[in-house]
Amino acid sequence: MTLKIHDTLTREKRDFVPADPQRVTMYVCGPTVYNYAHIGNFRPVVVFDVLFRVLRHLYGEDAVVYARNVTDVDDKINQKAADEGVPISVITDRYLAAYHQDADALGALRPTLEPKATEHIGAILEMIGQLVENGSAYAAEGHVLFDTQSFADYGQLSGRPLDEMIAGARVEVAPYKRHPADFVLWKPSKENEPEWESPWGAGRPGWHIECSAMIDKALGQTIDIHAGGIDLTFPHHENEVAQSRCAHKTSVLANYWMHNGFLDMSGEKMSKSLGNVIIPHELLETTPGEVIRWALLSAHYRQPLDWTPELLEQSKKSLDRLYGALRRAKDVAPDQAMEAPAEVMSALMDDLNTPLATSAFFEVSSAIEKAVTAGDTVAIAANKARLLEAGALLGFLQADPDAWFEGDASDELKAQVEDLLAKRVAARAAKDWSAADAIRGELDALGVVVMDGPAGATWRMKD
């Protein structure tokens, strides 16, 4: 079975063939650490975490090198530090730690490499020097700019003529530019901003050159997969291609380009500038990370995803159903010889079709339920293993089923519930139905839902 990827550059679905199966390389644009990331920022984190898991499954865990950068020099970071009156490192350390905390809670594996822009200034200056020497960049008024007209393939990735790209994007107009689309590689720092010495004067790098330099140092001049949000196609990724190809005189930066769609609210793109953002750092206080992850994977990654409270509710119900099946099968060990269902693998191999993949989970959970009712331990073991393997491929079903349903219940409450359930069992055995109903009422008052089944009663906290 071959993994197929929709390549943004060629506009078609292609068989994935790594340049070196023993070193599969992927790069995803990471955070600018000046504030908490919003839920739209985490869509690529979760989507391409699934890609990372699938590649590890196909080629081996040690064969996949996944780099996700950290932008830790930026105007917004400088402004945040100035507003709070603290060093820049306080801001970047705080929000990078929060980003890691949130990504972990959403079930994203840590990337193999996490290069920071400030740790690659030497590599950035080296690449800028190559571009100037090649005639692809020029110095002007303390700046160094990329000459877009020197690169014949500029615009190929986004598939739009240069004039159209300029009209549809925020392009800085400056008198020192040879062409309006020329972009900054190096610029002078303002007072109290971080700066580094360079052949063109003290300053700091532009955003686009950071990624090109970090890709080169972390992964090489040509990589297998470059991924990110669709909004990065132009100008960021277009500019990366131009810089990297001109600096190295190569024909390809990435063999496959992948872009996830926008996350919308009421049909409008979610963004901090519009003020319509959901912050996972806050949402995670009330919502399990797996629920948020399920919601983020509920639409195909290339399609827009409309974020609503109903989406989270449905995601919670879906996971409750799956965890419920695992809970009822908890006394049977999974059959380690079993693999994820073919339907799940087939869906993932078709350009990461996560909605189709997760829909196949429910057939397996139903098989578990039937096997539990029939007392068929062989079928329970086989299907439990298949469901857990499928979950591992997509980052789901990583919690203990009992803990999933008990939620944030304290140890004291858990003990109280178990005591009441034991008394209810005794009352039912004695056919004292009024006492059993009264106990159920006490449990309801505690916010506990009791579920009777063939293996006895289980419970969960109310949503």
Curated annotation (Swiss-Prot):
It comes from the Bacteria. Keywords: Aminoacyl-tRNA synthetase, ATP-binding, Cytoplasm, Ligase, Metal-binding, Nucleotide-binding, Protein biosynthesis, Zinc. PANTHER family: CYSTEINE--TRNA LIGASE, CYTOPLASMIC, CYSTEINYL-TRNA SYNTHETASE. GO terms for cellular component: cytosol. One of its GO terms (biological process) is cysteinyl-tRNA aminoacylation. GO terms for molecular function: ATP binding; cysteine-tRNA ligase activity; zinc ion binding. SUPFAM superfamilies: Anticodon-binding domain of a subclass of class I aminoacyl-tRNA synthetases, Nucleotidylyl transferase. Its main location: cytoplasm. A motif ('KMSKS' region) lies at residues 269-273. Belongs to the class-I aminoacyl-tRNA synthetase family. This is Cysteine--tRNA ligase. SMART domains: DALR_2. ATP binds at K272. Its cofactor is Zn(2+). Binds 1 zinc ion per subunit. The gene is cysS. Zn(2+) binds at C29, C211, H236, E240. The keyword Magnesium does not apply. It catalyses: tRNA(Cys) + L-cysteine + ATP = L-cysteinyl-tRNA(Cys) + AMP + diphosphate. A motif ('HIGH' region) lies at residues 31-41. Monomer. It comes from Caulobacter vibrioides (strain NA1000 / CB15N) (Caulobacter crescentus). Its EC number is 6.1.1.16. It is found in: Cytoplasm.
